[in-house]
Amino acid sequence: MGLAVAHQLARRGASVLVLSRRRSEAAGFVAAGMLAPHAEGIGGALLRLGQASLQRIPAWVAEIEADSDLACGLRPCGIVVPFTNATERDGYATAAWGTALDRSGLEREIPGIGPRWRAGLLFEQDGQIDNRRRLMRALERACVQRGVQFEEGSEVLELITSHGETSAAPAPVSAARSAAPARAAHPARLEAVRLRRADGSELELPCRTAVLAGGAWSARLLPQLPVVPVKGQMLSLQGPIGALPRVVFGPGTYLVPREDGLLVVGATSEPEAGFSEGLTPCGQRQLEQGIAALLPAASHWPPMERWWGFRPCTPDEGPLLGPGPIGGLWLATGHHRNGVLLAALSADLVARGISGEPSPGDGEQLEAFRWDRF
């Protein structure tokens, strides 16, 4: 998310510095890259945000590819959601956007699909992008080509404001809030950030405008943000090229086929794990059982990688976008399962807001995902 925002700001002529504690922590290097607002079965404002971002993605990818001279691996391959019966299929939250499939339709779209699945929905408008191997690398190069500077290994410790406060002190929480909570008459403004560099030295960096895109770690810097980590484990297999033509989004497991036959399999959802690192036998077994149920033949494909990461989750699983609790601080975090999907529009919304060039409808979208909406 941080790279996407940095790139859009740089394209608008801003001078951008990215402070990154550890590049490998970014969820963009962990996610499967599904572009699935319909297959996920989400609703309301989050669905509308996802649909709008999905429409923006082809042009967004074209901008990244033009600036980086690298392919991003975008594939509008469609996604199939299987069900055990037609009643479940017809009651799915986003069924109106899909094509109903019976068993023969499932077998046509997903050759070799497991026998328990009797119905399905095909969302041809959904797809995937190869984020781990292509998109993130292209975004980094696009940022560099646009003049973005990077400080890898630099951890932001505090946000220092004009009131002499720091982000280490949580904001007071009222017992109740109205639908449109009042803002402070004279909110503190961002003046600087205190950071620790890779060599252990600490300094204050003057800064009047910043974007917090800290993912699952965002609340460590701003405790009033309702963002918690949800651990996810994944694995990949090497299958034959073309063996699986579409993404399969099953209950608890999804299969994402890359063009070269690599099959990305995800993902566990472990809110109880906190920031506990590492793979677990239980988590890997869950993925293997999901593979066997969805595409039995894939259980015999050679294993390639196993990894884990942390999703930034909010109480309603929607992102925190727009102005934050400190003047000059913007938020682009809390995207949970949909960070790759929502990156295109989230980056636009934040970059346009900071640049003072909002488009019609931006205010409504940002209002729906205010940090203090809960």
Each language-model region and where it sits:
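Dinucleotide-binding Rossmann-like beta1-alpha1 core, especially the glycine-rich loop
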Residues: 34-112, 118, 290
